[in-house]
Amino acid sequence: MSQYAPFVKPYIEYNEFGWGPSDLPDLEVPYQPFCKGDRLGKISDWTTPVQERKYNNNKYMSTFGSSNSQYAYFHGNDDASFHLVNGNNMRALKPYQRNRYRPTQRNNLRLHGRNGRFNAAIGAGHGGAGAAGGAGASNKYGKGRDMRRGQTGRRFMRAAPVRQRQSSVVVRSDWVSIEEIDFPRLLKLTLPNIQEGADLITCGTLEFFDKQCDRINVKNERPLQKIDRIINVPGTIDDPIIRRLSKSLGNVFATDDIIATLMCCTRSNYSWDIVIDKVGTKLFLDKRDNAQFDMLTVNETALEPPLEEEGSINSPQSLSLEATIINHNFSQQVLKIGELEPKHKFDEPNPFEEPGVELASIGYRYKQWQLGDDMVLVARCKHNGVLRSPGGELQFLSIRALNEWDSKAANSVEWRQKLDSQRGAVLASELRNNACKLAKWTVEAVLAGSDQLKLGYVSRLNRKDHLHHVILGMQQFKPQEFATQINLNMDNAWGVLRCLVDIMLKQPDGKYLIMKDPNKPMIRLYDIPENAFDSDNNDGEETSDDRPFLNSKDNKL
């Protein structure tokens, strides 16, 4: 037995009292560190080349490709002479044509070579498609080209950041919300067959339009002058004519700018508010004292409205003040001003005259409309000038001005380059950026019964100078035709007004507020106390940070 090697029995642990492994610890067992909290899947590998990201790409795809080299098998001898044939679908280049399409062929050669190199690099990173034909193989059109196209699309299709606008008035805790109406509901309303309003009282004095202003163009521009005239714009309750008419006529009383704001509310983005006093069966729609209701907005409906920059001449507050002053000066400069110039006087004088104050040329019409169901609207409308037609008839005008401040910052067309040759492009740009303002001007002209709506184009003398301006041209429209051109449905406008009036007439007597939500396309109706806007209860409520366009100007220009 000594000639054979000894046989030693191995020790086997036997569990005599149970089923399963014994209590002895595991020794010499292959082990790789891991964490029980890790998700089952692909462990991050920072040693592989950086791969191009692609939308909806499988995050576990490269686990089974050749790029996961942690557990890959390498054999350097047998595969040393192995080379992968390029499997890309190479499009054959067109034969060279002498002196023809030379730039196209040169670009074709350059782009083709660039795409080939790019695809090879991407393929090597995605499972070795460029070197081993793994799971990251190129598709029909080339993986690199698709990736580059996808990245470009995401780069230029980023959504603009949402800007939080400030409310026109701070909603207090003691205000009771009555109703919230979103714009899609308002856009479905309609009230057809509203007849032209009937004149009740006409008052004021109008000056004649200077026809020489129609000849102004870019090459023959005219400086905008500062006209020291005052336009008093009292509210509905402060109007003595409306007070007199309310005793015998109508049950809804307002001004043309208030009605236009309600009719065009679905086009507005900035916040605004209107105060309503209900007394018995009568409604008085009015604006708050010292509010910025009469200020004009600039680029309100643009894709990129002006930024809130304190102290900047291109902030919404500064542009609003600039546009309001331009509109006032322009409406007076295009008229024949002088003691000897002819004037058209209405039946009654201006009810807002003040001794020692020169008033602007303006005429008022107090008109009434039948809205059905014994509802009569009485409103104060206005004209800015008058013109005698070739036939000798008087035509009443509504004169407004559009202003250019910085075409690059506003993402608009350059007026000095396009106004004479492509005036339609300029107007289309303004309709896109100032849709609400133009719609309200059109509604005011339609309500007043103006024969023409004259629009002036006023630009800065220098884009960095907001104090000096020039007139570059004028354009005139018939209000009804212009409403159709800008897609303004008057039946829907009357329907919106009637809907809001019906809601208010159902409420008990008191004071109410209609407010456009600053950040949502909806209007809100509140029941407010009688002293909601008194000076004693208004301390700390409305500041320059609470309302847009505050501390810009006083109501009087």
From Swiss-Prot:
Task: Provide the GO biological process annotations.
Answer: cap-dependent translational initiation; formation of cytoplasmic translation initiation complex; regulation of translational initiation
Amino acid composition bias (Basic and acidic residues), ranges on this chain: 545-557
Q: Where in the cell is it found?
A: Cytoplasm
* HAMAP family reported for this sequence: eIF3d
The Swiss-Prot or TrEMBL record describes its family as follows: Belongs to the eIF-3 subunit D family.
Identification of the protein by name:
Eukaryotic translation initiation factor 3 subunit D-2
Organism of this sequence: Drosophila grimshawi (Hawaiian fruit fly)
Q: Which gene encodes it?
A: eIF3d2
Q: Which GO terms describe its cellular component?
A: eukaryotic 43S preinitiation complex; eukaryotic 48S preinitiation complex; eukaryotic translation initiation factor 3 complex
